[in-house]
């Protein structure tokens, strides 16, 4: 097994070297037949080594590249496989297209390096009203009889469910025309499909605006359910000649309360909307407007929702308070009573589980920002039911994550500055090149785990072991970072500082154990522990006693840590893209 692994690694190394040479030879190879394949619909865990094992038996592979996100370095779900000759690549498509790779059917097609070829309308067709069971393979098999297919795909949502439409790109325009003539209006899995030329987004938008400006189809709702088809026809007949008048009904024949009218002339449709909308018919006001497609209605609803959300955010800006570390005995009524002296409360809510158990936090909304500010000043850190409250302005989740990420970055810079200052102090004391790094509580291992163990980052930093002892070579000389042998005086600032350090260390060790059990990542666990330890001790202790409160802080800190990692990788990602 070790030999196979070494062999695969060696082959991949050779491939990467060959891949670097491709850029210089690409112009010389432009006239040769393509031997490059696009492999899509891959599971995120699929690597270059995995693909090499699958494609190398077909023929000599010159290079493989799994495309990854520039920041997170996670797979984008597709890759490029380059063979030494065209015939091997063609065989790979014939034998491996739509075969499962880690549980997902891969989609293989010829790689089109020229974006103009991928985006051109010639040979590209659009198919809609597809049955949910039609997948990429079924679509390919259906249309491949008309000619060589460069690419085909059924559009899917985030869950992998078909959206009911897809695309097929033929090598020849004649193949696309034949497919449109033969399959448009035909039944596929019991559904009549539409097949037509693919239009660019600009062309579709232009056509859509033209259709809106010259609409003839009218939608009417809020119709009395006792209305007959004849009465509905008579209602709209006075506006002009119609192609169709449909009053929608259930399978049982019951009136659904809405219908559609398609006029021959656009002017008649406009007249119907203007004169019939908001008029009363059989005791009910009618809603009459241009008939819209489902996608258009969804877009409008989305815009309305966003506008309402932004308006709500602006309305509650600076007056909505977030309160945490609440005792389980505090309910909505008691929470309102606690904050009532500071102003007019419009709402007070303690968040609970499905079983009605308090989650330990809640929200109080005042009528003015001044009242909210006063409540923060008076109630923050105040003991209520034996617990110190944390009171602050409520923030959106994305804002909290951004602020936490900034805090992490600032904390790391401070630690780096502390390390530099310690190095300078050590040099001034006659120890050039040597210094005692500060204790990094944020990267403290659990008991029994060596500090310089598997984490290479901390080992390289030379961080101090958790007992604060310096390296062995200094033990016979001055010891920095630990109290003198005589110990601290029982009273005074030094004793208080020593006690706080011990308390922080104990809390850090306990937090690290819990966090490491969830992340199984030493670096992540250390950083998250350090973030939580930045809170005052009186806020950290309740986290160890309340699992739900701990889980809430852990999720927020984890999200902030991930955001920070992405920000740190940003410059590398940009350089990689430019390269």
From Swiss-Prot:
Biased composition (Basic and acidic residues): 1-10
Span list, region Disordered: 1-32, 560-579
Disulphide bridges, residue numbers: none
Domain annotation PABC: ranges: 487-566
InterPro entries: Nucleotide-bd_a/b_plait_sf, PABP-dom, PABP_1234, PABP_HYD_C, PABP_RRM1, RBD_domain_sf, RRM2_I_PABPs, RRM_dom
Keywords carried by this UniProt record: Cytoplasm, mRNA processing, mRNA transport, Nucleus, Repeat, RNA-binding, Translation regulation, Transport
Cellular component GO terms, alphabetical: cytoplasmic stress granule; post-mRNA release spliceosomal complex; ribosome
Biased composition (Low complexity): 566-579
GO biological process: mRNA 3'-end processing; mRNA transport; nuclear-transcribed mRNA poly(A) tail shortening; regulation of nuclear-transcribed mRNA poly(A) tail shortening; regulation of translational initiation
GO molecular function: molecular condensate scaffold activity; poly(A) binding; promoter-specific chromatin binding; ribonuclease inhibitor activity
CDD domains: RRM1_I_PABPs, RRM2_I_PABPs, RRM3_I_PABPs, RRM4_I_PABPs
Homology family: Belongs to the polyadenylate-binding protein type-1 family.
NCBIfam families, per the entry: PABP-1234
Chain's role: Binds the poly(A) tail of mRNA. Appears to be an important mediator of the multiple roles of the poly(A) tail in mRNA biogenesis, stability and translation. In the nucleus, involved in both mRNA cleavage and polyadenylation. Is also required for efficient mRNA export to the cytoplasm. Acts in concert with a poly(A)-specific nuclease (PAN) to affect poly(A) tail shortening, which may occur concomitantly with either nucleocytoplasmic mRNA transport or translational initiation.
PANTHER family for the chain: RNA BINDING PROTEIN (PTHR24012)
Protein name: Polyadenylate-binding protein, cytoplasmic and nuclear
Organism: Candida glabrata (strain ATCC 2001 / BCRC 20586 / JCM 3761 / NBRC 0622 / NRRL Y-65 / CBS 138) (Yeast)
Primary gene name: PAB1
């Amino acid at each position: 097994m070790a030999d196979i692994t070494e062999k695969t690694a060696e082959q991949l190394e050779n491939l990467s070297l060959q891949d670097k040479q491709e850029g210089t030879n690409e112009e010389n190879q432009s006239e040769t037949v393509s031997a490059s394949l696009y492999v899509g619909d891959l599971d995120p865990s699929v690597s270059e080594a995995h693909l090499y094992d699958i494609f190398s038996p077909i023929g000599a592979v010159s290079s493989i590249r799994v495309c990854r996100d520039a920041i997170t370095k996670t797979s984008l779900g597709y890759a490029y496989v380059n063979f030494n000759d065209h015939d091997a690549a063609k065989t790979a498509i014939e034998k491996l297209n739509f075969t499962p790779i880690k549980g997902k059917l891969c989609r293989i097609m010829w790689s089109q390096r020229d974006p103009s070829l991928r985006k051109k309308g010639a040979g590209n067709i659009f198919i809609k009203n597809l049955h949910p069971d039609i997948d990429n393979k079924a679509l390919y098999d259906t249309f491949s009889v008309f000619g060589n297919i460069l690419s085909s795909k059924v559009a899917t949502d985030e869950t992998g469910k078909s959206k009911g439409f897809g695309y097929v790109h033929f090598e020849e325009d004649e193949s696309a025309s034949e497919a449109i003539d033969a399959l448009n209006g035909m039944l596929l899995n019991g559904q009549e499909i539409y097949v037509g030329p693919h239009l660019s987004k600009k062309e579709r938008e232009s056509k859509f605006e033209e259709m809106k400006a010259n609409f003839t189809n009218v939608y009417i709702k809020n119709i009395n359910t006792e209305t007959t088809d004849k009465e509905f026809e008579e209602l709209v007949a006075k506006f002009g000649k119609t192609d169709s008048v449909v009053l929608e009904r259930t399978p049982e024949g019951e009136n659904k309360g809405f219908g559609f009218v398609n006029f021959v002339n656009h002017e008649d449709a406009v007249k119907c909307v203007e004169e019939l909308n908001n008029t009363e018919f059989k005791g009910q006001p009618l809603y009459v407007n241009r008939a819209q497609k489902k996608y258009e209605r969804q877009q409008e609803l989305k815009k309305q929702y966003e506008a309402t959300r932004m308006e709500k955010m602006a309305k509650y800006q600076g007056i909505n308070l977030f309160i945490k570390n609440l005792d389980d005995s505090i309910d909505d009524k008691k929470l309102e009573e606690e904050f009532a002296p500071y102003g007019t409360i419009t709402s007070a809510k303690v968040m609970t589980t499905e079983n009605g158990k308090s989650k330990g936090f809640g929200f109080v909304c005042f009528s003015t920002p001044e009242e909210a500010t006063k409540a923060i000043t008076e109630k923050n850190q105040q003991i209520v039911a034996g617990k110190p409250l944390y009171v602050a302005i409520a923030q959106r989740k994305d804002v909290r994550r951004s602020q936490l990420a900034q805090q992490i970055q600032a904390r790391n810079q401070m630690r780096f500055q502390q390390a530099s200052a310690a190095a300078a102090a050590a040099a001034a004391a006659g120890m050039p090149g040597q210094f005692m790094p500060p204790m990094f509580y944020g990267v403290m291992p659990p008991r029994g785990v060596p500090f310089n163990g598997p984490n290479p980052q901390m080992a390289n930093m030379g961080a101090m072991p958790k007992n604060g002892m310096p390296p062995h070579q200094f033990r016979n000389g001055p010891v920095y970072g630990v109290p003198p042998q005589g110990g601290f005086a029982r009273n005074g600032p030094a004793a208080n500082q020593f006690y706080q350090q011990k308390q922080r260390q104990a809390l850090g060790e306990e937090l690290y154990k819990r966090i490491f059990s969830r992340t199984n990542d030493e670096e992540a666990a250390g950083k998250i522990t350090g973030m939580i330890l930045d809170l005052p001790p009186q806020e950290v202790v309740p986290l160890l006693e309340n699992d739900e409160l701990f889980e809430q802080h852990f999720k927020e800190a984890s999200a902030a840590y991930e955001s920070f990692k992405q920000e740190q990788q940003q410059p590398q990602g940009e350089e990689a893209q430019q390269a």
